[in-house]
Amino acid sequence: MEKESHEENNHTISGDLTAKRKRGRPRKQLKLESNEHSLGHSPSFSRSQQQSRQRNDDEAMVGQPISGVIEATFEAGFLLSVKVGNSDSMLRGVVFKPGHCDPVSVDNDVAPDVPMIRRNSDVMHHDGSAKRGRKSRFREKRGSGVRSRALVPVPIQPAHPTIPNNLIVPVVLQPAHLENGGERVPIDHSPMQTETGSQASGASNGKPFETLLTQVMNKGQVQHTTQSVEPESDEQALSIEPLQAIHPIHPVHMLKPMPSYGRGKMTELLQAVQENVRETHFSQGH
């Protein structure tokens, strides 16, 4: 009696433990059952797998080299039997000449139960157009960048520097060779300095400069002939024209007069004499 009661107690305890046990690792039997349930796939999943396998087989055949024999000919084409790649299965079909066939439809299909392998031309065309589109976009972007670079305005610099109207630049004259065998007249090569028009006009209007010019003009005369020039003495007087004052269009109004460190009046007179000598000899030479 004690044994039976002990067995009943053990059975109830084990049943309670299985019912109450929720924490910890699951038992092996439950794990195996769950794996079996998980391995069982739905029918829709199996159908999709079959369709994908068929599609893969069909796509694998596209683009494979074939070898075969023409079994018969007819007016619109040929009857062929070919092998695909290295497979041993023979395929037979009809090949039509260009312009002698109509697209297969329900009315003219002689074997509607035979599946047809359709070429994925749409996908190939789409991929090619996408690649072309990327290339064309890249070229357009590159062309627009080149055009934008080409349209950048470039400042044009003048070949010869311009001088403002209110400035006078003195010209250094080269020594002129006299035709009558005279010696060269020395020229004082002083550094070039720019003077404003107001200062130049003021210097030209001074009385000492005009009196000096009149004295030089009264001292000698030059005899000009068309054929030859005969000097009367070693020192020959030259005709000098009075300088004209240059009046600027827009005179510069200066608050404080700038100190002039230029040449003296004698050097300006020598320059004027040299210019006249060159002009007279140039006119006589021609």
Curated annotation (Swiss-Prot):
GO terms for molecular function: transcription cis-regulatory region binding. Residues 1-60, 123-146, 181-204 are annotated as: Disordered. This is Protein METABOLIC NETWORK MODULATOR 1. Residues 1-10, 30-39 have a biased composition (Basic and acidic residues). It comes from the Eukaryota. Lineage-specific modulator of primary metabolism. Influences flowering time. One of its GO terms (biological process) is regulation of photoperiodism, flowering. It comes from Arabidopsis thaliana. Disruption phenotype: Slightly earlier flowering time under both short and long-day conditions. Altered metabolites profile. Mailny observed in young seedlings and in emerging leaves. Residues 191-204 have a biased composition (Polar residues). Residues 20-29, 131-140 have a biased composition (Basic residues). InterPro entries: MNM1-like.
